[in-house]
């Protein structure tokens, strides 16, 4: 058996990166000025046979930072009332501190070197998380500063679809449109979609890579 055929660990699969699925709901499109209102994160794990699956889930409603813009159109779209006391919202610091703590623990346990965000249209989620981490003065950010795995691009390649709901349905997954634009639900669906794309590539023989002499 080649060395490549034995690469079944999470640390081997993504060049030492620890994939963490993220989705955010916000009060606009500008990460510097508009409020982060909700964030969910799902870590991933790999079994002994090299199949990828969801692991730990974290979810927080977030208080708008002082001076944040709250765009009415964005709030109408996601249905979030930032002033609803039943949201149980926490500060950006509290939400990201807890997520980063769990992610750092996962990096260490898996033998990985750094976290990488998995998200649908990842630039949006990445920009808001990074801006919030900067505002919260969180120095030990475990995520890569710019690299991501974007499931919109991956699904376009693997499934011919770039919209999350259509990609999930094409992959044979359920998608409840009434729950869409909840950070928790969208993160759960994105995590399962990413795992399906990675595992489908493995089922098709694309991973582990063949040894050099076999190519």
Swiss-Prot record:
Q: Name one GO biological process term.
A: tRNA processing
- SMART domains of this UniProt entry? EXOIII
SUPFAM superfamilies associated with the record: Ribonuclease H-like
Cite the active-site annotation. Answer: 181 (proton donor/acceptor)
Concerning its family, UniProt says: Belongs to the RNase T family.
Disulfide bond sites: none
**Residues reported to bind Mg(2+) 2:** 23, 25, 181, 186
Which gene is transcribed and translated to give this protein? rnt
Name the UniProt key words of this record, in alphabetical order.
Exonuclease, Hydrolase, Magnesium, Metal-binding, Nuclease, tRNA processing
Gene source species? Escherichia coli O1:K1 / APEC
UniProt name for this protein: Ribonuclease T
Question: Quaternary form?
Answer: Homodimer.
What InterPro entries does the record point to? Exonuclease_RNaseT/DNA_pol3, RNase_T, RNaseH-like_sf, RNaseH_sf
EC numbers on record: 3.1.13.-
Functional summary from the UniProt entry = Trims short 3' overhangs of a variety of RNA species, leaving a one or two nucleotide 3' overhang. Responsible for the end-turnover of tRNA: specifically removes the terminal AMP residue from uncharged tRNA (tRNA-C-C-A). Also appears to be involved in tRNA biosynthesis.
Show where the Exonuclease domain sits.
20-194
Q: Name one GO molecular function term.
A: 3'-5' exonuclease activity
- Does the record carry Metal-binding as a key word? yes
UniProt-annotated binding residues for Mg(2+) 1: 23
The note on cofactor binding and number reads: Binds two Mg(2+) per subunit. The active form of the enzyme binds two Mg(2+) ions in its active site. The first Mg(2+) forms only one salt bridge with the protein.
**GO CC entries:** cytosol
User: Which residues does the UniProt site feature Important for substrate binding and specificity point to?
Assistant: 29, 77, 124, 146
Q: Looking at its record, which EC class is this enzyme?
A: hydrolase
